[in-house]
């Protein structure tokens, strides 16, 4: 609908606005549907005691537009009497004179020094100093803080240079609340999407829009973090007199890509503040309280406003404790602690403040923090107040994340960025979920549950086993229980006992174990060695390990193995059957002395002499081993796994040694015994066959050998060359090639005539001359089929050539 043509008020016109009478003094400006005048009011404004006010006249084409004006008026009423917000005085709405529209009159505070943009235009040559910029930013942020502190919060959505005014006493005030709204949740259907998109395009300025405003498909709410983005653009513009996305446009906004001009130059901390406020992800931007705190630090002034997020969290937690509702207690010092004052004595403990992750909802327990006149943060704890932590950090109304100051932003408390560090990135919000515990804060707090310390100690506890008696709750004990090297991991996992023999000292253990081990491995005689047979059926190895276990445990081979860790018997008496395995700084066994070494050497020599004197009889070895230990089960295993099939007993069977069982446990079958003997003799007979040697002949690069029908193991058969064949080869100058597939000779095509002398090259002439001199065969590659023909080779020449080429190998 077209804007209705309404004439301007003449100076001196008297209007009634609510309970005030306004007399028009001067017309100031107009834009869109609004006209702005200065007027003299009566009675005067009780807040400022001024009788000069600003009269805003708005033409509303239809009744639906009255809701927008009503929202603006309500917002100004909520922010009344804030020194950094243009104060509301009175308002009135009525039908226009022509009756086709509505007129809304709003009386508000008059700022005599005009707008911020007018002040900036006076400093085009002499740009603003950093101190001036920080002062403008501080007062503007205080005005926005008043909006975000409301419950539910108000979002300005149109923060820009043109909407900041300067009062007669030099205060900067935020104005134009026509775009104010609550938190806008992400649209869930097409209708909501179109409505939100139209609302953003109507009530926001393009260069100040945040990425979540431009790209609604991201599904992010439009909340206080959108105002933080606009404040970042605002700060950039008062520094450089242009917006950061003037050239790149929406593409730069969506990915937060911009550059800092080289002139004018400002501190890195100020640039870093801009960078933090212009983070692409809303969760990585600081909240309004953190922005104000950082600006105050840059000014070296105390923060003028207390962090209402922390106050709400403290009050909510206190109410929860008073009501007797259970609250989860957590170990609070897992957060990073940042010193408030940058210059402090080393010997004096600094004042620390935990940077906790809070939201706009009073749903997070933390310390009540107050800032006194000395710019020191005081952390107080009420009696009986337990510090709680809630995982759901949600912003008001929309239950969305609102993560405060991150690690990079918090670093501005006590240090500045490197001059070249201009593109430092933020950690995502997920990085704040489970911070690691660093140290206890120097604070006097109420007790925390002991379960917290148990959980923390369990996290840092080593993986190896620690006895319950050696572990205390005060300090992390070093495991004093180390497993013996003779215990395998399999036995440990089965948690069975290893019974140690009684009254065995270190030297006896050494001697017994070493003798047992050597008996098993080498054997005092061939008959005693269970792993020396020529055909190992598997039971010999099994019996060898049975011997090893018998030597280590002192029990029978068939006894069950177990590892017992007796936590009660710690006196270390020698009579205890089950001993606790305790590690020490020294070895469990003493070192070998010279006597032991000499004894072992003599035993070794005796065993070798015995083995040399005894005949190599596998049957005698087998029988002797079965007599010594009848529980190995090697005979049954050998019979069941032998590859030799059972046959009739032959009359030619040789000597039949008798196997004598122990204690009648094994009944010997005569037929099976003969079968065993026959198989063993067959093996011995086969071992007497001459050893076949395999050569590497025939493995040349160009040698192709067909399948041989002979039983020879050599893969290549070379036919000896005869003198007649050699002379024939020299005469013809061609190698006769015979194929093994058909047995017929293949005749080669006739040799081409020699090349005329005038066409031959020098190299060919030299080669032909050398051939004539040496009378050798031409140098040709022997085909792969010429395996039965040997070329004449001078061995002496080859040997001389080899010595010349490889002198080190001769």
UniProtKB/Swiss-Prot annotation:
Binding of ATP, residues: 28-36, 56
Subunit organization: Interacts with ABP1, which is required for proper actin patch localization.
InterPro entries, A to Z: Kinase-like_dom_sf (IPR011009), Prot_kinase_dom (IPR000719), Ser/Thr_kinase_AS (IPR008271)
Main location class: cytoplasm
Residues the record marks as active site: 158 (proton acceptor)
Species for this entry: Saccharomyces cerevisiae (strain ATCC 204508 / S288c) (Baker's yeast)
Polar residues composition-biased segments: 553-566
Protein name as it appears in the record: Actin-regulating kinase PRK1
Role noted for this protein: Protein kinase involved in the regulation of actin cytoskeleton organization and endocytosis. Phosphorylates PAN1 which disrupts the interaction between PAN1 and END3, and between PAN1 and SLA1. Phosphorylates SCD5. Preferentially, phosphorylates substrates on threonine residues in a [L/I/V/M]-x-x-[Q/N/T/S]-x-T-G motif.
Positions of modified residues (Phosphothreonine): 553
Residues carrying Phosphoserine: 402, 428, 484, 556
Positions of the UniProt region annotated as Interaction with SH3 domain of ABP1: 743-756
Keywords noted in UniProt: ATP-binding, Cytoplasm, Cytoskeleton, Kinase, Nucleotide-binding, Phosphoprotein, Serine/threonine-protein kinase, Transferase
């Amino acid at each position: 609908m077209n804007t209705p043509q309404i004439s301007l008020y003449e100076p001196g016109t008297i209007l009634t606005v609510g309970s005030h009478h306004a007399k028009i003094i001067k017309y100031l400006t107009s834009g869109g549907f609004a006209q702005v005048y200065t007027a003299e009011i009566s009675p005067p404004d009780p807040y400022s005691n001024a009788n000069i006010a600003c009269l805003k006249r708005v033409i509303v084409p239809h009744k639906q537009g009255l809701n927008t004006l009503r929202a603006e008026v309500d917002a100004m009423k909520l922010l009344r009497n804030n020194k950094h917000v243009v104060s509301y005085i009175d308002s009135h709405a009525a039908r226009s004179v022509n009756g086709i529209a509505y007129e809304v009159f709003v009386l508000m505070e008059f700022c005599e020094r005009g707008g911020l943009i007018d002040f900036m235009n006076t400093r085009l040559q002499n740009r603003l100093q950093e101190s001036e910029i920080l002062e403008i930013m501080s007062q503007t942020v205080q005005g926005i803080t008043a909006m975000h502190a409301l419950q539910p919060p108000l979002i300005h959505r149109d923060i820009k240079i043109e909407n900041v005014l300067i009062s007669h006493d030099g205060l900067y005030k935020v104005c134009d609340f026509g775009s104010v709204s609550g938190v806008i949740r992400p649209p869930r259907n097409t209708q909501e999407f179109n409505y939100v998109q139209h609302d953003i395009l109507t009530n926001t300025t393009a260069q100040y829009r945040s990425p979540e405003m431009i790209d609604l498909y991201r599904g992010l709410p439009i909340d206080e973090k959108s105002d933080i983005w606009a404040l970042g653009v605002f700060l950039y513009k008062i520094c450089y007199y242009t917006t950061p996305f003037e050239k790149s446009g929406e593409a730069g906004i969506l990915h937060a890509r911009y550059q800092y001009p080289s002139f004018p130059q400002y501190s890195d901390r100020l640039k870093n503040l801009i960078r933090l406020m212009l983070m692409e992800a809303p969760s990585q931007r600081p909240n309004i309280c953190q922005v104000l705190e950082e600006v105050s630090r840059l000014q070296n002034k105390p923060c003028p406003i207390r962090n209402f997020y922390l106050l709400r969290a403290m009050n909510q937690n206190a109410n929860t404790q008073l009501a007797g509702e259970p609250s989860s207690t957590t170990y609070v010092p897992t957060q990073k602690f940042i010193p408030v004052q940058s210059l402090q004595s080393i010997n004096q403990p600094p004042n620390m403040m935990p940077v906790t992750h809070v939201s706009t909802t009073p749903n997070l327990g933390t310390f009540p923090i107050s800032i006194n006149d000395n710019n020191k943060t005081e952390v107080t704890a009420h009696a009986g107040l337990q510090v709680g932590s809630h995982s759901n950090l949600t912003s008001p109304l929309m239950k969305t994340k609102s993560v405060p100051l991150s690690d990079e932003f918090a670093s501005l408390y006590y240090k500045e960025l490197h001059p070249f560090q201009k593109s430092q990135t933020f950690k995502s919000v997920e990085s704040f979920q489970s911070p690691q515990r660093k140290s206890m804060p120097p604070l006097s707090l109420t007790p925390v549950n002991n379960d917290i310390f148990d959980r923390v100690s369990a996290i840092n506890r080593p993986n190896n086993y620690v006895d319950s008696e050696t572990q205390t709750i005060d300090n992390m004990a070093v495991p004093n229980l180390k497993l013996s090297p003779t215990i395998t991991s399999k036995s440990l996992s089965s948690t069975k006992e290893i019974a140690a023999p009684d009254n065995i000292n270190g030297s006896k253990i050494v001697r017994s174990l070493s003798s047992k081990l050597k008996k098993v491995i080498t054997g005092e005689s061939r008959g005693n060695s269970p792993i020396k047979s020529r055909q190992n059926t598997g039971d010999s190895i099994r019996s060898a390990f049975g011997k090893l276990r018998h030597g280590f445990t002192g029990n029978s081979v068939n006894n069950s193995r177990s590892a017992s860790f007796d936590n009660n018997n710690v006196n270390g008496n020698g009579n205890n059957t089950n001993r606790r395995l305790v590690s020490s700084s020294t070895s469990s066994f003493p070192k070998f002395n010279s006597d032991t070494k000499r004894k072992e050497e003599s035993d070794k020599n005796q065993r070798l002499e015995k083995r040399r004197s005894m005949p190599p009889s596998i049957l005698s070895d087998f029988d002797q081993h079965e007599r010594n230990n009848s529980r190995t089960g090697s005979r049954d295993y050998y019979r069941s796994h032998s590859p030799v099939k059972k046959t009739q007993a032959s009359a030619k069977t040789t000597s039949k040694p008798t196997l004598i069982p122990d204690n009648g446990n094994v009944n010997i079958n005569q037929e099976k015994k003969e079968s065993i003997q026959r198989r063993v003799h067959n093996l011995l007979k086969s071992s007497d066959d001459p050893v076949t040697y395999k050569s590497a002949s025939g493995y040349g690069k160009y040698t192709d050998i067909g399948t041989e029908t002979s039983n020879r193991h050599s893969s290549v058969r070379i036919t000896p060359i005869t003198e007649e064949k050699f002379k024939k080869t020299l005469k013809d100058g061609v190698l006769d090639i015979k194929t093994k597939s058909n047995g017929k000779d293949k005749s080669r095509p006739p040799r081409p005539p020699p090349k005329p002398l005038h066409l031959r090259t020098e190299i060919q002439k030299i080669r032909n001359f050398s051939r004539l001199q040496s009378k050798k065969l031409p140098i040709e590659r022997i085909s792969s089929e010429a395996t039965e023909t040997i070329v004449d080779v001078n061995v002496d020449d080859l040997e001389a050539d080899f010595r010349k080429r490889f002198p080190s190998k001769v």
